[in-house]
Amino acid sequence: MSFSTFLNAKKKEVELPDFEGALIADTHAHLDMLEDPARALARSGLAHLGLVVTVASVHENARTICDSLEGWRQSARAMLDAAGFVDIEVPEVRVIVGGHPQDASKMTDEGRALIREVARNKRVVGIGETGLDYFYETSPRAVQKAQFAEELALADELDIVACLHIRDAHDDALEVLRSTGMPRAGAILHCYNMGPETLAPFLELGCMVSFAGPLTFRKAHDVREAAALVPHERLLTETDCPFMAPEPCRGQTNEPAYTAFTAGMLAEATGLSLRECAEVTYSNARKLFGCDK
């Protein structure tokens, strides 16, 4: 099967939404977790992505991620050229670096120093994913809260965005955000998959809201209701790949190209045209991450 073919969950070829030439952005991916990051970037170019933001963990790949990006992009360029797609651009790739809340107990002074060091790389546009995760509770809540506050403060100091991972902990996360303060550059409520009531206080704080595969799930009516309430200038799209592929690809390994399906559903939920949704979310992402500075 050609790398330019997109398949649904039944392994049938599926067409991507038509954004009429507009570009889209995957604001939260884990490229290093994919079998072939270069291939994924080539496919994302075919799916009209102009920007992919990948996450680097201080406990895994923070030292190497920035050095890997150009090699992946060059290989993606070669794949596209070899397949005859010489006019398709490989998306820009930027990085978010931090310590996941599930790993908060692993954080050391050396880890904190490494985050600070890597965050000064020009490709790094945010701190994260940071926050609270009470679903697995692999780290004590108090330790998670302390790390969350530290990373919010670091994002503010460096004037870059904080990417928030919050699971089963929204009330406590609000408490930390209010006590520590929002970073000057803003914060992203990543992979939002709850209803309007949970979202409201985060909107009041000024958070951007990023939607991923769960927005497309058939029974996720509350998530789509929440999306409809987000001011257009706060909307973002993402995959969180390789996890939670959107419909019609649910059950497969997720990849940045599948942002197109989430963007298509976001357009429907918000009443925007496909082109309008692409233009709004892409512009929001580039502005938030300072891609044009």
What are these regions (language model features)?
Residues 1-293:
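Mid-domain alpha/beta scaffold segments of enzyme catalytic cores
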